[in-house]
Every structure is written in C-alpha cells, then in structure tokens.
From Swiss-Prot:
PROSITE patterns: STAS (PS50801)
Enzyme type, top EC level: hydrolase
Lineage of origin: Bacteria, Bacillati, Actinomycetota, Actinomycetes, Mycobacteriales
GO biological process, one term: glutamate biosynthetic process
Name of the protein in its database record: Glutaminase
SUPFAM superfamilies registered for this protein in UniProt: beta-lactamase/transpeptidase-like (SSF56601), SpoIIaa-like (SSF52091)
Catalytic activity: L-glutamine + H2O = L-glutamate + NH4(+)
Family from the record: Belongs to the glutaminase family.
GO molecular function, a single term: glutaminase activity
Residue stretches making up the STAS domain: 321-423
EC number(s) given by UniProt: 3.5.1.2
Length: 423
C-alpha cells in the first residue's frame, strides 16, 4: 500500500479562528507612541508552542513588533531568577491594583508598587536586573540576551521606537522620580525609564512569544533547546502573578472567562500559558479601553472554550492520551484514554503521525474516554479521516456513546464497530 505522511489539522483550525474575528475593527491602536499610532492596525496572528516543542502558527505569525508590556513577566522571571524572591518581594508586591497599567499604584504601608505587571512595578523590577551598579546598556543587554534564550533565537531592539517613546515618557518619568524618592530604585529616573523602555522595545513575533510562554508552561525548560532558564518555583510565581494582575483592571473577568495566566501589551501582543501544556500568543494592534487587544481577547475566549484551557476545569490532561497501539492481525487498534481536550488530541495526532501502520484496517478505541471537548473531538476525528484518506479502512469503537456523531469534515461518516476486532 502506498501511504503518505499525515498532516496536522491544527493550523487550519487556527486560520478559521482568525477569520472569525478578522472583521472586528473595534478599538484603536495605541495613540501615545508615534510608531504605534501610525502602525498598520490590520495584522492578525496566532501561534502556539507545546511543552514538547511543537509549534503551530497562522496569519501574520512572522510579523515583528515590539514587546511593550508583554515583556513584563519575562523580566520579572529574570529578576526572580537572578536576585531571589525575597529581594524582589521587598521591592514590588503581588497584589492586583485594580487600576490602569500606567497608574502609580503603591502599597500604602511600604510604598512598594502593587505588582510587577503595572508600569511602576515593572520599572522597579527592571532596576533589579544585573544589580544596582549596572549601567543601562549592560542591564538592557542582559535582558535582551535572556529574552533571546527564551525565544530560541537572537532578538533585536527597535532603537528608533525607544528613542521616540522616551521623548513622550513623562508619566513613566514621574513614576520613576516617585520610586526613587521612596527608595525603591537607586538609578537616576531618566536612566531607569530608558532601561525599561529599551526592555519594552525588544522585537518579537507571535511565534517567539509562544515559545517564550511555553518555557514558563514547562516549568522553566526551553522546549526547543532543552535549556533550563527558569526555576520551577520562579515559573509558578510568574504565572500566578500573570493570573491575578496580567490583564490590568480586566484581570478578574479574564480569569473567570478565559481562565489562564496572560499578559497583554499596547503594541497588540497577548500571551497566555496553560501550565504543563502549552504557551499561546496573538498579535492584533487595536486595543480596548483597558489596553488589551480586542481581537486577541476574542481569540483567547474561543480557544479556551474549544480547547478546554480553563485552569479551573477538571478535565486537564493528566496522562498520555494514547494508551496503546496494538497490531491484531491486519487491524491496528489505537486505544485512547482520559478526557480529550486539545492537548490530549494533539498527543494523539503526533503519535499516529509518527506510527508505521501495518495491515489494512485501523480501529479507534475510545471506550476509556469519558468526554470530548469540541476541539478534541474535531482533531481526533480529523486525524482518523486522514488515516482513512491514506488508504486504510477505519472505524470507531465507542461502547458508551461518547461521541455525538461520527461525521468527518468532508461530509462522510466513520463506521462504528461493536468490537475492536470486527472491522
């Protein structure tokens, strides 16, 4: 039998998600940075990286943009890794502020910024990196190099944008002066804001951000290089802070509806992390009144619903989706187990893509699957359809009637068998 490599349907699904939100032109690009104000508002991208290093992308996922506030959790990770939690916690708190990202939100008793996801906290965190005696350039190079290691490639800084941004950084300068007055930072206010602005000006793509967030999802191990860049405890601290404060004064609604740690930036980037499983990133420049990307938020809502991403869900993957693949005469039986959310279905797809099938028949045994999420159902059936289109006779063994239908995406239907060996 002539067979062909199976292809992955995930990018096709991502393209559908992008098309579903592309017509939404509400919101506006950031107005206070000239390059962002004049930027094309139409690029749209979605990228994902699993903790196993599988990367998927759609749309303008190779389009470069500056990180802006999306840089905050990664700089926070570097400060925690370098200086230790005790020193960092003495400088910046962990509580959500409930205020806009550029408010001077300080703890009333300690004068610490409320959290590292607002500008006051991010400026303070930036000043911890490479030590208080560091020059601006040495500190910024430490940050750029660390971000590059997280992304798995060399990243560059948009110096032209940072120069323009610093010219209009009056509010951040006033925040830095206040932090210096309270003894939170030691650098000259201008140098502190310059260092922070250069941090925000590191250029990335959505694919870069997906890999960077997947590193946090993997407990600090970079999924492409295998390098340990963040201690597991540090990764937990960063993700916890993203969950409580990453989406500014929209954080509570975000956690309730989407349910994963996330961080947005005014250039249009938005990242999210499903611990232990994957990192996600979108790019769409138009922002809502809270400063979060309009279409990015809608994409994450759709992904959370379809893929079963919510942290409070009881169905998150705890075991390998493929229990066994057995050759029984001329029939290959693929046994699945556990709840079929996106991560489980992706595990199934990668397993069958690499498998060298023998014989002429393939039966998918889902007797140990208690439920399917919409995206899990779609990916599993699409994978089976592509096995069929590769020349095999296929069927599904579903004694508990877990699947509501056996329809494939091309309008055909998979047969059902009462015994895995009867096909």
């Amino acid at each position: 039998m002539t067979t062909h490599p199976l292809t992955m349907p995930i990018p096709e699904y991502f393209e559908e998600i992008l098309e579903s939100v592309r017509s939404d032109v509400s919101g506006e690009v950031a107005q206070y940075i000239p390059q962002l104000k004049d930027a094309d508002p139409n690029p749209l991208a979605l990228a994902m990286c699993t903790v196993d290093g599988h990367i998927y992308g759609a749309g303008d996922d190779e389009h470069e943009f500056t990180m802006q506030s999306v840089s905050k959790p990664f700089a926070y990770a570097l400060a925690l890794q370098e200086q230790g939690p005790e020193k960092v916690f003495a400088t910046v708190g962990l509580e959500p502020s409930g205020e806009a990202f550029n408010e001077l939100s300080l703890d009333g008793s300690t004068n610490r910024p409320m959290n590292p996801m607002i500008n006051a906290g991010a400026i303070a965190v930036n000043q911890l990196i490479n030590g208080s005696e560091s020059s601006v350039e040495d500190r910024v190079e430490k940050i750029r190099s660390y971000f590059s290691a997280l992304a798995g490639r060399e990243l560059n800084i948009d110096r032209q944008l940072s120069e323009t941004e610093i010219e209009g950084a009056d509010r951040n300068l006033s925040i830095a002066h206040m932090l210096r007055n309270y003894g939170i930072i030691e650098d000259d206010a201008h140098d502190a804001v310059l260092s922070y602005t250069l941090q925000c000006s590191v250029k990335v793509t959505a694919r870069d951000l997906a890999v960077m967030t997947a590193t946090l999802a993997a407990g600090g191990t970079q999924p492409l290089t295998g390098e340990k860049l963040v201690d597991a405890r540090v990764a937990r601290l960063v993700l916890s802070t993203m969950a409580s404060a990453g989406m500014y004064d929209e954080a509570g609604q975000w956690l309730a509806t989407v349910g994963i740690p996330a961080k947005s930036g005014v250039s249009g980037g938005l990242v999210g992390v499903l611990p232990g499983q994957l990192g996600l990133a979108t790019f769409s420049p138009r922002l809502n009144s809270q400063g979060n990307p309009v279409r990015g938020v809608e994409i994450f809502k759709a992904l959370s619903e379809d893929m079963g991403l919510h942290l409070m869900s009881a169905e998150l993957l705890t075991q390998h989706a493929v229990r066994a693949i057995e050759e029984r005469g001329d029939t290959t039986v693929i046994q699945l187990q556990g709840a079929m959310n996106f991560s489980a279905a992706e595990n199934f797809l990668f397993t069958v893509t690499d498998h060298d099938f023998t014989g002429e028949k393939v039966v998918l045994d889902i007797s140990r699957v208690p439920m399917f999420r919409p995206m899990g159902r779609r990916l599993v059936k699409e994978g089976l359809r592509r096995i069929r289109d590769n020349g095999f006779k296929v069927a599904i063994y579903d004694p508990e009637d877990i699947l509501p239908d056996f329809d494939f995406s091309d309008g055909t239907k998979s047969p059902q068998v009462d015994d895995p060996e009867e096909l």
